[in-house]
A protein has these predicted regions:
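Short active-site neighborhood of thiol/selenol oxidoreductases, capturing the structured segment around
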Residues: 30-61, 73-74
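N-terminal "domain-start" segment that seeds a small globular fold
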Residues: 1-32
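A generic fold-level signal
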Residues: 10-13, 36, 69, 183
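A short, polar/charged loop-to-alpha-helix boundary motif
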Residues: 204-228
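Catalytic metal- and UDP-sugar-binding loop of GT-A-like glycosyltransferases, i.e.
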Residues: 44, 77, 191
Length: 229
């Protein structure tokens, strides 16, 4: 059983061991597979209901190749059920090692939690981002991560726009995962061959305007190069 951390792991912390069902092959995805062999970029995402996450995963194929040139493997973990992931990625294959974690326990073992939505009547002085927020606060902080939108939009409008653009149809599994973990943060952790975190990025640390964001390709490759020196 993985231990749950209240705060995101930092460089120097030991990464949690995980073993999860693999999406694009039989077997499992495990951090131990890389122990004493090579570093790993572990990317933790929300479920397929999240259009930003779907796009980040699609872009990982390019990043994966560049990280591979630095001797770093790439593993993405999606907060959904195995059969749903296999159904989706069968028609949208990606050249990235994928695992599923429907309870998001791996995310929380890395200290990446979800925020609690409070009533809109909550005194703003009582809100403590990234632990708590209100729907009003989220709607008042428009986003456009990585320029995927024609202009900045609130999260609900952005999600609807991208889902429609992608032709994405929500399933019962997607709806259930969204209900349970819709406010889960995403993250990327570079773990060296010894199992130690060397670099990390966690979504929206500075405020809700960062929702939907992810570490950029250049940032991840630079981190990989840094541990190779």
């Amino acid at each position: 059983m993985m231990n749950i951390s209240d705060n995101p792991l930092r460089p120097g912390d030991t990464a949690p061991r995980f073993q999860l069902p693999a999406v694009n092959r039989e077997g499992t995805v495990s951090l131990e597979d890389y122990r004493d062999k090579r570093a790993v970029m572990v990317c933790l995402y929300r479920g397929l209901h999240c259009p930003f996450c779907r796009r980040h995963i699609a872009r990982l194929a390019t990043v994966r190749d560049k990280l591979g040139e630095q001797g770093v493997a790439t593993v993405a973990i999606v907060n959904t059920e195995l059969e749903r992931a296999r159904q989706y990625f069968q028609y949208r294959p990606v050249r990235v090692e994928l695992g599923t974690d429907p309870e998001a326990l791996t995310h929380r073992a890395f200290g990446v939690t979800k925020f609690v939505l409070m009533p809109d009547t909550t005194d703003p002085r009582e809100l403590q981002w990234p632990r708590t927020s209100t729907m009003a606060q989220l709607m008042n902080n428009p986003v456009n991560p990585h320029g995927d939108l024609p202009e900045k939009m609130n999260l609900m409008a952005a999600t609807q726009y991208l889902n429609q653009k992608d032709g994405f149809e929500m399933t019962d599994v997607d709806a259930r995962i969204s209900q349970a973990n819709g406010t889960q943060f995403t993250s990327q952790f570079l773990v060296d061959a010894g199992g130690v975190v060397r670099w990390s990025f966690v979504e929206a640390r500075d405020g809700p305007e960062g929702m939907g964001g992810s570490a950029g390709e250049e940032e991840m490759v630079a981190a990989a190069k840094a541990i190779g020196r």
